[in-house]
Regions:
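An acidic/histidine-cluster motif and surrounding catalytic segment
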Residues: 1-55, 59-180
């Protein structure tokens, strides 16, 4: 399984924590100073259509992360899976429609999907309005009629830190279902 961590240099200590559980993960440090450009670069040139787990740098992994995530993926290898949920309503695994907001802290891309994300960006109606909103782009690329799986309990926790992309965002974006 390919694991890719998207990161910025300021978050290297967090990346080092992730690498303790996933030592063979590919770490991509943003070279563009542009979240969307970096995201598309990773999708096109690093994942390049392979099945992969894409992680952000500001997360904490559950214990036995790799064992848990690979067990879920083995049951749903052809499905977009999100491993972080902010929902207080759904405390168990559930399906969401494509085109909805898709949290990007940790997600599994099935074979070929990363290239669909790159292609979808060309026709994405929010490209100008939401230049860093790859969380919406992923749902758009997956499509309206394709539900994706949101796994609960969350296998990652969003750290309580300021967003580098948008410092005005709340740092209080943690999952109630995360288990250490």
């Amino acid at each position: 399984m390919l694991y890719v961590v998207r990161a910025v240099k300021e978050r290297k200590p967090f990346v080092d924590e992730i690498l303790k559980q996933i030592p063979d993960a590919v770490v991509y440090y943003d070279r563009f100073g542009n979240a969307m450009k970096s995201y598309l670069h990773v999708c096109k040139n690093i994942i390049a259509g392979e099945p992969a787990v894409l992680l952000e740098d500001d997360i904490i992994l559950t214990s036995n992360f790799r064992e848990k995530i690979e067990a879920v993926i083995s049951q749903h290898p052809d499905t977009l899976i999100n491993f972080f949920s902010l929902s207080k309503k759904y405390l168990e695994p559930h399906w969401k429609k494509g085109r909805e907001y898709c949290m990007n802290q940790c997600e599994y891309f099935p074979e070929g999907f990363s290239l669909r994300v790159v292609e979808a960006y060309e026709n994405w109606p929010l490209k100008e309005k939401e230049p860093t909103a790859y969380d919406f782009l992923v749902g758009y690329a997956w499509g309206n009629n394709n539900p994706y799986l949101v796994w609960c309990p969350s296998l990652v926790q969003h750290r309580e830190v300021k967003s580098i992309i948008n410092p005005r965002r709340s740092s209080k974006r943690q999952s109630v279902t995360f288990e250490v």
